[in-house]
Amino acid sequence: MKRPIKLRSRGPTRNGDERVKQSGPERRFNNRRLIGRASDRRSKMIAFGYYGGKFSHLDFLLPLLPTTFAHFCEPFGGSAAILINRPPAPVETYNDLDSEVTNFFICIRDHGDELIRLISLTPFSREELVKACRPEPSLSEVERARRFFTRARQTRTGLAQTSSEGRWAHCVLTSRAGMAGAVSRWLGSVEGLPQIVQRLQRVQFENAPAIEVIRRYDSEATLFYCDPPYPHEARGDSKAYGYEMTDREHEELAEVLRSVKGAVAVSGYRCPLMDRLYRDWIRVDANTRLCNSSKGERKESLWTNYDPESSSQTAGYGLTDKNMYLFERPTRYGPRKHAQKSR
């Protein structure tokens, strides 16, 4: 029986991060193997802001999610920032338990011209936000989608979940492009919608519990990217998501993910709960950043049951020099040692 390797901290890295003490060989994430051609780098798309959304982490996450699988499935879809910024997979599934979010994406896919026209005619107005925040069960699906987008894009926080009548994002002195900064951002968000319409044409949508979707679409050719609500111990606010998860629900999710045939990647803040649930999976850490909800530092991490360092799985992406990530390989992998290439 081999004796465990005794590691010692080597101090901060050149970008200020502390190296990780780990049970396997300590290494830097090899970004050179993942640098793609300049023509492969795509402009980033975003439909709306979302608490816990991964738009700001695209440079970190996309190189770690293999593009070789036949099916890409997001059980916790949220703003779909990961899905719409990936190259299309042969089969793609988006799921979210919030029917307002799924209704918006379905409407913009199936009624894109009409919805974009209505949104473009919507003034940047406090009254529009007030109207959008008041539920009316008799609304059409398209009008529901328009009001959802208004809530998401005209609120002060810029997050769909935290919109309210008193949070209209008006400006006093800030200007941009010859107009109030908030108005400019609103118009810019509308201009970006046609690209998103085109990208969503090939996506199938679900509005169901995440575990139900995982079991339904599990196969050896499926890559699940799971971005569940951050555990409560890793953040300061307790009601940031429309649908929260308890620690027990996180445990149930981990039990299911450990039993699937497919490859799995799980996003989250590092905390004792996540480290315990995915202790024998590979973990990659992003640079430490400030967490607004707790006014402290939080480390965004990705846990995988496959080896994300394999260059054949992540061709076409590049890591920028400013994003150097820590890579931790445990002594043993989880239920799956390497992602299998779909046939």
Q: At which residue positions do the language-model features occur?
A:
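SAM cofactor-binding core of SAM-dependent methyltransferases
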Residues: 63, 68-135
